[in-house]
């Protein structure tokens, strides 16, 4: 047991998206397991939670960010420090869906990378009767980004854990690929070019296990 606790990997996750898409509700449902009904625009909130994901302990540092345009100047700061990003839109708002590409482009520009760990999250899937964005549109956008896609509901807790777990998995995969590339540049073994997601469409993979033994810190 002592060996398992000698090193606790911390992951800096950032939740981004337009105003009113449910970023805070999604984050609080994941961290505290309850739904926040009232809409109170966020400036910036940070949460920590310890989880076991794929038999590996992870300390998640989750930053819930402002969606309002007046706080746009703060974006580059958290984009510089984030290791992975949940790109959240609401299925009831086409405008929020169209904003996702802008957020993604800004992340790549700030990181100076061709690709970076992200997951496209279509929130409010419980409001099917108000849907403006089809599931296939979200899946196609994620495929274009080379990342995973998941539809969620913070209200009834659908796929909430999966969204955050999938982002941690994307970060782990990205870091391994970067290490492989580093070994190649120093004469090591094979691998793909920096930041590429080799193999099949990430959305063809299984949903993965549930998050066991999570602790809010």
From Swiss-Prot:
Positions contributing to GTP binding: 17-24, 64-68, 123-126
Region annotation Disordered: where it falls in the sequence: 181-200
Stored SUPFAM superfamilies: P-loop containing nucleoside triphosphate hydrolases
One GO term (biological process): signal transduction
Alphabetical UniProt keywords: Cell membrane, GTP-binding, Hydrolase, Lipoprotein, Membrane, Methylation, Nucleotide-binding, Palmitate, Prenylation
Entry's EC annotation: 3.6.5.2
Documented activity regulation: Alternates between an inactive form bound to GDP and an active form bound to GTP. Activated by a guanine nucleotide-exchange factor (GEF) and inactivated by a GTPase-activating protein (GAP).
One Pfam family hit: Ras
GO cellular component: plasma membrane
Family classification: Belongs to the small GTPase superfamily. Ras family.
Protein name, entry field: Ras-like protein
């Amino acid at each position: 047991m002592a060996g398992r606790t000698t090193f606790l990997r911390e992951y800096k996750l950032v939740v981004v998206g337009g105003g009113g898409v449910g970023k805070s509700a999604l984050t609080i449902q994941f961290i505290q397991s309850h739904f926040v009904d009232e809409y109170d625009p966020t400036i910036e909130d940070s949460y920590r939670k310890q989880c076991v994901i794929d038999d590996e302990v992870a300390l998640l540092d989750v930053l819930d960010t402002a969606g309002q345009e007046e706080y746009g100047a703060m974006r580059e700061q958290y984009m510089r420090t984030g290791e992975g990003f949940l790109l959240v839109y609401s299925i009831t708002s086409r405008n929020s869906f169209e904003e996702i590409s802008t957020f993604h482009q800004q992340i790549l520009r700030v990181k100076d990378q061709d690709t970076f760990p992200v997951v496209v999250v279509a929130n409010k899937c419980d409001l099917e009767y108000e849907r403006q964005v089809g599931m296939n549109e979200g899946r196609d956008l994620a495929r274009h980004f080379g990342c995973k896609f998941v539809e969620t509901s913070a209200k009834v807790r659908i796929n909430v854990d999966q969204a955050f777990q999938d982002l941690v998995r994307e970060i782990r995969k990205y870091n391994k690929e970067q290490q492989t590339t580093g070994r190649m540049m120093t004469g090591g073994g094979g691998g793909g070019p920096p930041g590429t997601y080799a193999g099949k469409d990430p959305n063809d993979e299984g949903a993965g296990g549930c998050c066991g033994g999570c602790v809010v810190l």
